[in-house]
Amino acid sequence: MSAKESLLTGTFEERVEAALDALRRGHGVLVTDDEDRENEGDLIFAAETLSDSQMAMLIRECSGIVCLCLTDEKVRALGLPMMVENNSSQYQTAFTVSIEASCGVSTGVSAADRVCTIQAAIADDACPSDLCRPGHVFPLRARPGGVLERRGHTEATVDLMRLAGLKPCGVLCEVTNPDGTMARLPQIVDFGRKHDMVVLTVDDLVRYREMKENKSAAA
């Protein structure tokens, strides 16, 4: 067992299954990535069940840059261009232009307004005219192959929603410490205990998908 795994509860399969159950019940989960990557933890909620109080928690306890993870198909359906033509960020984080609901919001920055924007974007019949640009919600485009293609929080979020049987749209924000520094695994685990949230890793999800997909291929 690695030092990282020793801080976590259960096996990778148990952690993923617990996270899927939590998401189905409308609860948040905490996902950390590789220590040699961003080495950060994100608080993640299903977009379709996100409440105003959960959004307020993302704003209060995290960095405040609340992101909406979407599939490539959804990004295209909403007509969202990428934030920049040539992405030179270290981990190729796929930000589109930021968005706001075209109706039902005031300044767009409150918790309720951001939830309104997210609900407008993930609606089954959502179209480009339902959103204004720019805004206070930051969509991220997930790679089609999920965490097996890119080991990022964006892909982990969409994969978790799919595995949970939810819309493949999730909301994330990086957890920060009270002093504004980024929370690392020990602080993420403490945060999870305080708020009764499952903590898992992107690597857990990679292993879980590989296990399930290998079983399906062998059947």
Swiss-Prot record:
Catalytic activity entry: D-ribulose 5-phosphate = (2S)-2-hydroxy-3-oxobutyl phosphate + formate + H(+)
Residue sites binding Mg(2+) 2 per the record: E38, H153
One Pfam family in the UniProt entry: DHBP_synthase
Cofactor: Mg(2+); Mn(2+)
UniProt site (Essential for catalytic activity): H136, E174
Quaternary structure (record): Homodimer.
Protein name: 3,4-dihydroxy-2-butanone 4-phosphate synthase
